[in-house]
């Protein structure tokens, strides 16, 4: 990542072409598709928990989470830890056919560790390698790897 920089349309297309070649040369497309479907099961759960960190429903009204309720925050962190354990196994499976994905697990571990130590910004804050930021980046990487776009039916 380079702050202030982004790929051109041509650069994105070339990157996706190379990713498609990687899947074909390594013969890992089918396995990656299966793993991606499993990722899609976890994705809405991660997003739900990230939302629970940011917003609470009190008396039927959604309000920003001010993090004053330590029990609520502890429950949300516990949910994220359970999801993270599931994600770790899946990410390990992704790394076998696609070793370039190996950097995501340590980054997610680091973010979750910082949340556990009381640094709540590492849960969802943009601009940090927060759990949500890294998860989103992983999702974008998987979409590009498989030549997909969000909202194309299976995202």
Which residue ranges define each predicted feature?
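Short, amphipathic alpha-helical interaction segments positioned at domain boundaries
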Residues: 9-38
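Short, flexible helix-adjacent loops and helix caps
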Residues: 20-24, 51, 58, 120, ...
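Short, amphipathic alpha-helical segments
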Residues: 26-33, 40, 70, 74-77, ...
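Charged, low-complexity intrinsically disordered regulatory/assembly segments
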Residues: 60-155
């Amino acid at each position: 990542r380079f702050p202030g920089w982004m790929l051109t349309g041509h650069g994105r297309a070339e990157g996706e072409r190379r990713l498609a070649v990687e899947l074909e040369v390594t013969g890992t497309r089918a396995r990656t598709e299966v793993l991606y479907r499993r990722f899609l099961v976890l994705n809405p759960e991660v997003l739900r928990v990230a939302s629970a960190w940011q917003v609470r429903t009190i008396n039927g009204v959604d309000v920003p989470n001010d993090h004053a309720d330590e029990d609520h925050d502890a429950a949300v962190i516990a949910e994220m830890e359970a999801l993270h354990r599931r994600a770790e196994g899946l990410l390990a499976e992704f790394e076998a056919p696609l070793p370039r994905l190996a950097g995501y697990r340590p980054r997610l571990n680091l973010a979750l560790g910082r949340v556990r130590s009381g640094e709540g910004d590492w849960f969802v804050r943009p601009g940090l390698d927060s759990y949500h930021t890294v998860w989103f980046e992983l999702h974008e990487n998987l979409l590009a790897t498989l030549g997909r776009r969000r909202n194309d039916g299976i995202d």
